[in-house]
Amino acid sequence: MKASLTAIVCAALLSSVAARAADSQQILAQWRASVRARALPPSDVHFVRQGSDDSLPTVTDEWLGADGDYRVRTDRKFDSDEIVLKGGQAQRRDWDGYVRVPNGDELARLRSEAFAARVLAFGPSGEFAVRDIKAGADGCCDVLTLTPPGGIGFEWTIDRKTHLPVSSYELEGEGDAATTKYADWSASPWGTLIPHRIDVIDSDRVPATFTVQSATSLEAKPDADFADLVAGPSDVRMTSDTAVLPFTMEAKHIVIPVSVNGHAPIGFIFDTGDESEGLNAARMSSFGIASYGRTAISGGGQQVQSAYARDVEFGFTDGVVLANQHTATFDATGLERALGVPIGGILGYDFISRFVIEIDYKKQLMILHNPRTWSYPGTGAIVPITFDDGIPYFEARLSIPTNSDLPAHVVADFGAAGSITFTAPFVKANNLLTLIGTNNTVTRYAGLEKEFFAQANSRGVVPELRLGPIVERAIPVSLSANTSGAYGTGQFAGTIGETIYSRYHVYLDYPRNRIIFESTPDAATPFKQDKTFGLTLIAAGNDLHTFVVTAVAANSPAAKANFQAKDEITALDGVPASKFALSDLRNHLAREGESETFTIKRGGKLTAIKTTIVLYGGNIP
């Protein structure tokens, strides 16, 4: 009976699969007929589209080769970008004229974008897999997921009456999603119906609209149309092949002094999780820089408004200059309050990619090497990385109670303070709250909940992490409960941050797609388990020396010492707040067994709290 039941179930499943496959082929056949698709592309074609992108006048030139080659150039009012895809491999010239070779998820997505362009120009061919078929939510459409060779799946919504695509949907890097809508279908010069209006609705950008200005069939394929991209002039100036930059560690973030357009140096956060560079919009007037365009960023938390800047020059110690840069702009006031130091912006891919970067955490030195002359002389652990829009990824393996070899596609995030933060979908899919959770109370950074970097996490311990030849054990980790931002996405498993990297001497070798780890004595020491005095602090005021208690954990040592939310710490052991930084205050609060005297302003009155610092493993407010 059991065998018969199994056979019946299997037969039903096979019948269902066959029916779905037949349905998809019928939908595709109707789609081809509706757009008058031809068996083979008649020739190479060239589109010119005009519209607006990030509130900027924009022209896109798109070339499609009959043999599958693809090229697209996007010219906005103040910047441009170009991609060439040949033989399944790609090149990308960014807004600074730097040419790179995409790989990993980014390459897969570019292959799918080129495939989508061919589908719209010539109709759907047979060179893809139909991964899924379902009915649209309103019942008037069918939804097909089409995946080309080496690409990722795009969802296409097909109208059941016209059999034309209504829209397509793709997931982008770090969980961003874009829906593209198609309208005004009419005949092209080569006979196929094409959409003359395209609307792009991106999850973290201003909606964009493009209309076809010209669609041309090219009789012959000019070699220049798909030639390799040529980089612009180098944007790096170095007085020698090696430069040494000092840095400080602020709340486990590397902060480097940088001069912007010749102005006095200010701290910039070093962040591999940033795809370009960023300027603090709140300080741009002091740099003499104006923004252009309009977009949004979400980072690990809430979405906030953003824009762009151009003609930016970054000056570093030891004679290093990065010139003629385009950057994003964003309000970094929240970062300043969290770190307690003035922040000019963020240094991401557009800085990191120009060098091989050596990080000596013990000496707090960053050594920049010329990638054309540098070669690795050591025997460290080499871990390969891939990139998605300039963000590096590892392929890690985890050991958890039910799976000793769980794969994890993780961001190599040197801008993250913690050890590992797992995304909410990865936590749910692998039952991590139950399997490795140590404190399931979800905590947020009180006072900064609406910032782009805001997170909502509970805590756990991973028994083992394997990163190439590196093995780390008993690692305290964060388990995200975010429903938005990067940690709310299921595109990657999580981020690995500074708590792990700072145990090593590190080389970031972007030109060779690798990060090298040299062991130090710290790498052999057990991880410190999470303990806290029970206070959350931010730095307020123009000088960032007004230290405000934003939360006190219930039943914590801080609560027992009579600290309260909204307290202002005006002095420590008789030293006024103007004489020390937020990092100094945090260091004192981590010195278990030390006696401290805090002067507190509460309700306009001063009072003293004398206490011995005790750390506990309870909730972190």
Predicted regions and their residues:
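Positively charged n-region of N-terminal signal peptides that target proteins for export
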Residues: M1-L5
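Bacterial N-terminal signal peptides
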Residues: A7-S16
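Sec/Tat signal peptide C-region and signal peptidase I cleavage site
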Residues: V17-A21
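Flexible, processing/modification-adjacent segments and terminal tails
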Residues: A22-A29, Q89-F154, R160-T162, E172-D176, ...
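N-terminal mature ectodomain segment of secretory-pathway/periplasmic proteins
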Residues: Q25-Y98, G126
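Short, hydrophobic/aromatic-rich segments at coil-to-beta transitions
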Residues: P41-V48, A66-V72, D138-T145, H163-S167, ...
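Beta-turn initiation residues at beta-strand->coil junctions
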Residues: G51-S52, R73-R76, D94-G97, L146-P149, ...
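Pepsin/retropepsin-fold aspartyl endopeptidases
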Residues: G123, T157-K161, Y169, A183-P621
